[in-house]
Amino acid sequence: MELDTFLYNLHFDTDKLLPPDWQPDWEDAPLPYKLYRGLPEIPLTADVPLTLKGREANSIPSLEEFGHYLWYVYGLTRYSQAAFIEGTEEKATVSYAQLFRRFVPSGGALYPNELYVYLKLEDVPEGVYHYDVAHHRLIFLREGNYDSYLSRSLGNRYNLSDCFCTVFVSTVFGKNFYKYNNFSYRLQGLDTGVVIGQSLEVADRMGFSTRVCYQFLDRSINHLLGLSEQDESVYAVIPLSIYNVDQFNIEKNISISATELSREVPMLKHVTYNRSKRVIDYPELKEINKASMFETTHSFVNIKQDIPLNNALGTELTILPFPEVISYDLASVCRERHSPDIDFMLGKISQTKVSTLLHETFSFSYQKDLYNTQGKLGTGLNMYGTFYNVEGVQDGAYVYDKSTHALRRISKGDLREYMQNSLTVPNVNLFQVPLVLHVVGDKDHLKKELGYRGYRIQQMEAGILVQRLLLTACALEMGGHPLLGFDSNQSDELYGVNSKEKTCLIQIPVGPYRPRVWLKGSLNS
C-alpha cells in the first residue's frame, strides 16, 4: 500500500486497513508491558505520595522522588474488573474483563508505549534504564555517560550536562496491532501524545523543566536503548532539568549521521518477554516508521509558527465569560479520571464551566523543538464541537476562537442525532452528552515540513491537548472519553473544514456522568 494511501485510509476509509477475515487472537495477546530478563534491577518505592505538591525547583530529585514521577506518568495505578453481558436474551452469558489501568487513557487499555530513562542521579549508577511498570522498578540496560552522544543525536541543540534525566517514549508496534491491525498506527501516535502530556503535567508539579524533542536521529537513539526498529522505536525525547532546557540554533554546516554515531557504542542484546507465541507481521507500520526516520541532522527543520484561526469561520460570535481560576491537586484528579461511556448523564452546563474548560486546555503550552524560538508555543490545532444544553449558548456546531476567547457558530440546532449516527463504534450514548468536541488539524499532517514524520508528530500534539482537556474536565467534575470510532468525513462536512484543508483528528465527548459500577483497587502502598 502506498504510504499516502495508508495515511488517507487511517482517517477517511478505515475499512480498507483491515483484512476481510481479521480477528484478534485474544488468547495470544501480548503483555501490556515489556519485561527484561537477567538484568540488574533497582526497586522503586511503592509508597508514593497521595498528593502532588510543588517541590523545591532548585534541587535535583532523589531516586525516591524520581520514582514518584515515573509512577504518576505511566505506572500501574489501578486494577479493575468489569462485567459484560454477551449473547441473546434467551441465552446470555456474563464475562469479566480484568485490566491493569494507568492514569493515562489508551485505546483498548493496551498501552503501546514504553519509558526509558538516561539517569544521572547520586543514588544510582549513571546510565540507561527501562522503567519496568509491572514491578515499579528500573532495569539497568547500559552504564556510562552519554551526554555527548545524546546531544549529537538531538542536533547539538541542548546542553544535556545540565539535565539530570532524559526520558525516551517509545512505541512497541505489536502491543496494539494484534487487536487493531493497521489502525493501530493512528492510536500509537495519540497514545504517545497522551503520555507526553501527562509527563509534562507531572514534571511541572515536581518543579522540573522540560522540552519535548520530536526531531532526533532515530537509529542512534534506538541503538543506545538496544531497540530493534522492526519491533519498537522511540517517538519522543524529553530532557528533564532543574534549569531551563534552552535550545540552540541548528548548525547547518555540520551534519551528524546516525550510522556513524551508532558505531561509538556497542550493540545491546538483551532478552525480553511479551507472552505472545505467534509473531504477526505489520509491513505497513514498518515501512512508514522507516520513512519517518531521520538519518542525518540535515533533516531537522524549524517550521512556521501557529497560524491564527481564520475569523471567516462562523459569523455569529458568543463571547465567553472570564474563566474561573482553578487550582487542583493533580494526584486526586488522576485518581478520579476515567473514560465514561454509558455513564454519561445529561445535565445543563454553565457557560463559565465551558469557558474555563476551553481556556485551561489551550492556555497550556510547552517547550518543543519545532520552532526556532525560546518561547513557549501552543500547537497548530483548533477545537470544534457540537453544543447542547449549554447555558447562554444556542444549540449547534461551533469553533473555539482562541484569540478572542469566543465561540463562532457554524450551524444551528440539536446535532446529537447527527453525532450519534456518525459513530462507527457506538459505545457512547451521545444523546446524554452536552459537549462533543473535536481536535482539528491540517489534513496534510505536517508532511510538507516534516515528511511522513509529521503525521506522528501531529498525532502526538493532539494527544497532549487531549490529556490536558481530560484533566481539566475532571477538575471541573465532568468526564471525557477520547474516541476514534467516528466518521471523519461527516464531522469535517458539518464543520466545513474541508475547504480549509483541515480534518478532525479525534473526538472527545465531555459532560457530567454517574458513578460507574465496577470493582477496582489501587496499586500503591
Name each model feature, range by range:
Residues 1-465, 476, 480-525:
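N-terminal accessory segments that position/regulate proteins before the catalytic core
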Residues 473:
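Short surface loop/edge beta-strand patches of beta-sandwich-type extracellular domains
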